[in-house]
A protein has these predicted regions:
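N-terminal targeting signals for export/organelle localization
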Residues: 1-63, 210
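A short beta-strand-turn-helix
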Residues: 58-61, 66-87, 110-113, 167
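Conserved redox-active cysteine motifs that mediate thiol-disulfide chemistry
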Residues: 83, 91-108
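Short pre-active-site segment immediately N-terminal to redox-active cysteine/selenocysteine motifs
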Residues: 85-87, 92-95, 127, 172, ...
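Structural microenvironment flanking redox-active thiols in thiol-disulfide oxidoreductases
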Residues: 100-150, 160-166, 200
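Thiol/disulfide oxidoreductase modules built on the thioredoxin-like
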Residues: 146-206
Length: 210
């Protein structure tokens, strides 16, 4: 009887391991697909110049949807806190390889245009398990390590999934929305483009091209 119980427990553990492995593999593939989509041409993309697709968001010309998120310290940060500034709302994740390429460009451009009233809000799309405080703390530390490693000087917010719907679903990463001083989205970029294109859209948000 005791031996049967041990065998039963062993089978349960075996099945639990494979269930976890299957979930982890599916999650990894889902993350990879979101980055892979960045180099394809989904709906809303116009003609490409030099291989970089130009994205036309349905939100362009409309007010940026309001939100309130937490930063890594737990402080509440709202879009309204940056009223009167030109912004890039940059949706990214620690596991996103194109985001790792793009981040140094954003850092340089932020430092270059900050004196003109420009800021980057980096909104992490990393998964957060709020039902498990231990896991949540570990996930936040992972994001914080990335931020420290990349020396990101601008605000970093978490839980992008909670605001993904009003911003069009965030089918690919990185995704950026360029917001002018009046709070209107003047441009958007889906996936990795180029530093020059990011700078051009920052200047548009600042009104430098008008």
């Amino acid at each position: 009887m005791k031996r049967n119980a041990l065998v039963f427990i062993a089978v349960l553990l075996f099945l639990a391991f494979f269930a976890w492995a299957g979930w982890a593999n599916l999650n990894h593939r889902s993350q990879a697909a979101r980055c892979l989509l960045a180099s394809t041409a989904p709906r809303g993309l116009g003609s490409a110049n030099g291989g970089a697709a130009r994205y036309v968001s349905p939100l362009q010309g409309k007010p940026a949807p309001a939100f309130t998120l937490e930063d890594l310290s737990g402080k509440k940060v709202s879009l309204a806190d940056y009223k009167g500034k030109a912004l890039v709302l940059n949706f990214w994740a620690t596991w996103c390889a194109p985001c790792r390429i793009e981040t140094p460009w954003l850092i340089d451009l932020r430092n270059r245009y900050a004196a003109q009233g420009f800021e980057v809000l980096a909104i992490s799309a990393d998964d957060l398990d709020r039902r498990n405080p231990t896991r949540l703390s570990s996930e936040k530390r992972q994001i914080a390590r990335f931020v420290q490693q990349m020396q990101m000087p601008y605000p970093v917010l978490i839980d992008a999934d909670s605001i993904s719907k009003p911003y069009g679903g965030l089918d690919a990463l990185p995704t950026s929305f360029f917001v002018d001083r009046k709070g209107t989205i003047v441009a958007a970029q889906l996936g990795l483009t180029s530093k020059a294109e990011i700078e051009a859209n920052i200047r548009k948000a600042l009104g430098a091209n008008q």
